[in-house]
Amino acid sequence: MVHRGLLRGAPVAAEGELIFTTAATGWGEILTDPSYAGQIVVLTHPMAGSYRIDPAELESTRVHARGLVVSRLVTPPRGPGRSLEELLIEAGVPAIAGVDTRAITLELRRGAARRTVIRDGEQSDRAAVAAARQSPSWDSVDHVASVATLRPFTVPAVGARRIRAVLVDFGVKR
């Protein structure tokens, strides 16, 4: 199935497993959540981007989702933090806006996981579908390796009480 919309975020192509979330807010948290590694996220809520994202509320230090699908992407008022689109551009992650996300969600609920591509309009529908079919399935990729910490690090203590703990990181959230 091909859905046409407006390319937003980073002007690049992306491929991944298409999944959806019904969250009305928390877009920065969703995109930076390690559990979304390798996935293109559909937001079922009809509007995204209405507020600025506080970096302290992100789930990790970088965006793990491969792409974003929204019905309507808006620009928030000026203020501290980044807009949703700024976060996507800085992370090199594309979005597609102006599509019927509820219809896409119903399609997803009826079937198995879908390999998906976000591409610009230069590619034919047939070529886009072929690219999606040829992309690796989500479970054939080691996503833990892409989200796990490569080197030990120390988290600074907060408050007077200090403890020593060890965490094995398979994609830990902040």
Model regions: which residues?
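N-terminal beta1-alpha1 cap of cysteine-dependent amidohydrolase-like domains
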Residues: M1-R174
